[in-house]
């Protein structure tokens, strides 16, 4: 049996068992969907996105907002936009019409607590691999809204859990480059990972203090400029390695120990600087092997625990070469490589292309499929990171997903701006009930 079929079969069996064990008590049952309604709202970049309400017969309302990415993978599910002149071509009228038309027709009358049935009903209408007919943004809005309606005044993280939960370690983007900033820095995200603490509130405090420390470090160096889409500082720098130096300086200046308490994670987003002749970084053109050796030199000099998208989304050989050489000492994360897609992930598992995956709900389009991919990754021994998008909303559902799936890590931007802090604040609330904190990276 091919690996992809074997893994998917195992995951679907486990997912079916998890769904059957979800709390189908009177508190959750009987929430028959009476109305699905979509509308346009604005995201953190001032672009249109979708908000969906799910109303049930008992009066429960579930509401969800859908994020949007800037550096998007070519293999992601389709985010349906209107094109034309209105809203700069980024309107979502067609996607909203799909929510209020065919999606509503398919979901009204179903039990919101049966997530698999809800999502399957939408996938039956749109069976395209990329969700090009209805739009992944339309489908995800409805999927998340139904999940919220099913839970009502309960907790999403408890509803989706199989019994193992923990507050994730945050990967906090404090210096922005690439497609997320108007600067000359190629690397898209320089993140801090406050792993050397006993509780999430302690880690959050360290992250916030280092964020403000970096502002002072950059100001003193005459480099304080604007901020990026995710709230991190966006200076022009002589070279990408300077970003690492300034982050280490900020950690020390805030009174913390680099490596022991706080480490660094990178989202290189290398697809953004990959051209026909190679990778264009720091004014040089490199092939995959040369770029991998550059990363290795950074690993030798800085407390880096995670590198996301070090190579292009179809440069499989470079991924495998680097993971086989460095995977024992760094988390190699596929985002554009996998786009939360089970077929792409199965290929990566077979090729030993990475040892971790970034999970973005809008890359695949439904809650159920997201849970399947998380299950596949865990079955393969992969690390899992639940992630926001650069165009975010006040919706905090990814915090619940990270805790409920015991993902261990969450990536949701700088500890600033309400579209980012809504997730950090939700984790604070959850930590009042869930006292287990992820121990990832604490061996360092």
Question: Where are the model-predicted features located?
Answer:
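Short, Gly/Pro- and small/polar-rich lid/capping loops
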Residues: 13-48
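Metal- or metallocofactor-binding catalytic centers and their adjacent structured scaffolds
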Residues: 67-155, 159-160, 204, 232
């Amino acid at each position: 049996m091919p690996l992809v079929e074997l893994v998917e079969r195992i995951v679907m069996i486990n997912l079916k068992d998890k769904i059957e064990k979800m709390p189908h008590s009177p508190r959750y049952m009987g929430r028959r969907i009476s109305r699905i309604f979509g509308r346009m709202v604005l995201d953190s970049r001032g672009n249109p996105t979708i908000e969906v309400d799910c109303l049930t017969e008992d009066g429960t309302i579930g509401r969800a907002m859908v994020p949007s990415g800037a550096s998007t993978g070519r293999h992601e599910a389709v985010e349906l936009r209107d094109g034309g002149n209105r809203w700069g071509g980024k309107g979502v009228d067609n996607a909203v019409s799909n929510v209020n038309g065919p999606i509503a027709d398919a979901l009204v009358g179903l039990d919101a607590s049966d997530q698999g049935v809800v999502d399957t009903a939408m996938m039956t209408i749109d069976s395209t691999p990329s969700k090009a007919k209805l739009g992944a943004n339309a489908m995800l809005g409805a999927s998340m809204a139904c999940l919220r309606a099913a839970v009502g005044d309960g907790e999403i993280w408890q509803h989706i859990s199989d019994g193992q939960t923990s507050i994730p370690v945050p990967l906090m983007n404090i210096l922005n480059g690439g497609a997320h900033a108007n600067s000359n820095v190629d690397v898209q995200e320089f993140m801090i990972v406050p792993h050397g603490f006993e509780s999430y509130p302690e880690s959050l405090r360290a992250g916030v203090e280092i964020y403000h420390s970096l502002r002072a470090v950059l100001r003193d160096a005459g480099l304080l400029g604007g901020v990026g889409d995710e709230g991190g500082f966006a200076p022009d720098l002589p070279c990408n390695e300077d970003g690492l130096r300034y982050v280490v300086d900020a950690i020390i200046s805030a009174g913390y120990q680099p490596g022991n308490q706080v480490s660094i994670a990178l989202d290189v987003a290398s697809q953004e600087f990959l051209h026909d002749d190679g990778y264009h970084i720091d004014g040089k053109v490199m092939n995959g092997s040369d770029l991998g050796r550059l990363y290795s030199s950074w690993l030798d000099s800085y407390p880096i625990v995670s590198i996301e998208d070090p190579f292009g989304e179809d440069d499989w050989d470079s991924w495998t070469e680097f993971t086989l050489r460095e995977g024992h000492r760094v988390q190699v994360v596929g985002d554009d490589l996998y786009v939360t897609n089970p077929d792409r992930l199965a290929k990566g598992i077979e090729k030993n292309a990475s040892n971790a995956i970034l999970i973005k709900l809008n890359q695949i389009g439904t809650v159920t499929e997201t849970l399947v991919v998380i299950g596949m990754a865990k079955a393969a021994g992969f690390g899992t990171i639940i992630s926001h998008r650069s165009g975010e909303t006040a919706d905090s559902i990814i915090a619940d997903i990270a805790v409920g799936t015991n993902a261990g890590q969450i990536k949701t931007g700088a500890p600033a701006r309400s579209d980012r802090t809504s997730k950090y604040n939700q984790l604070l609330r959850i930590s009042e009930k869930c006292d287990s904190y992820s121990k990832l990276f604490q061996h360092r």
